Amino acid sequence: MALLAGLVAPATTAAARAAQGALTPTVEEQRLDKAAPQEILRRSGFDSVAPDFARDLTRTHSFEQARGIVVRDGTALWRHAVHRAQGRGPAGGDLSRDDDRPLYWARLGMTRDVRTWEPDFGIGDAQRSALLDQLERTSRGRSDIRYPSRATGIKRILVTGFDPFTLDQDIRISNPSGAVALALDGKVIQTDSGPARIEAVTFPVRWQDFANGTVERTLAPYLPKVDLYTTVSQGRTGRFDVERTNGAWRGGYPDNDNISSTGTIPVAAPATPPQWTTTTLPYKAIVTAHTGRFPAYDHTEVTEIPTGSTEPVVRPDGPTPGSTAREGGGGNYLSNEIAYRATLLRDRLGLHDTLPGGHVHTPVLQFGAGNTDPATGKITDPQFVRNRLAIIAQLRSILTTAANTALK
């Protein structure tokens, strides 16, 4: 997600999407019928998730019954994906357990079912929207965050990941940050200050969800209660980056619904939001520790419009005073935006000096040699799996290093 600035493709406007009507599947949902998503679902055992959910929906006789089914099945989907990723229960097929894609495509099948469902008892736009919101919340782990009591002495770490994206370029794409979330959710790691429990959630790659406040609604109840947090996304080839600075600018690259958004990141009052926010992760310790096979960098470069100027300038060492953001360290797509929103929320909650938190970019998850052509390639290969497992293991090591340094 890091390096998408300036690569603005033709995009659907929000108004055009709204004009399609409530019962029309989204662009994102329409990809579900392609061969690769269907193979991913079939080879993981997730191909029955949406059909079973649709059957349960048709048996309801009221909105409240439907809401109960959505909460139940959304929660079950998240837990099933976590259990599969962590080696519990049946694999459901020969697709490697660490794969994040079955969850993504199964969820889209469920959201499409809700969006196109026309029950005999009738359902209004607000009710349908409420069901979709509940499905997003439960199937992304947001209603499943469980930390032990402080009396146990166990530290608390929160991690976020993302859905796959740029799927029109390669429908097979996986997102290692989503795989990290599934692999680490509920795990306890050993740190120098004792055990720490990780809880994880995932976010969509959609501008409107962010504008609607999904990041703040998800994180606000927990940032005051955790000891460390890290937002995670896929970034550059062959390297991890701890993003030092985040910028308040959307660069316009289309999201998973092919919708574009350009301008200052829209955040709620109070006060005028700053152009820049900064990490409070112990970046020096992270980049000097041996955490895995990929190098890790303290990434300080941003793009700004300096005070008194109108043209953007790349600053290798971070922003100058009074400048206007055009790219944070993580670019100006949704990875930069979640980093900006989370760190701004941290600061608005008065936690800047007490809560270590910021954004980590993973390496790009690459397919193996001979399997790079989206038109002819397979949905997985041994090198692809090894790369994803290496990224997951190194992110866990990075979290351990951060906790060892910051939670003494």
Segment roles from a protein language model:
Residues A19-A325, A342-T343, D347-R348, T354, ...:
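N-terminal catalytic or cofactor-binding beta/alpha core of small enzyme domains
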Residues M1-A18:
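Secretory targeting and sorting signals
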Residues G330-A342:
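Substrate-gating cap/lid alpha-helix
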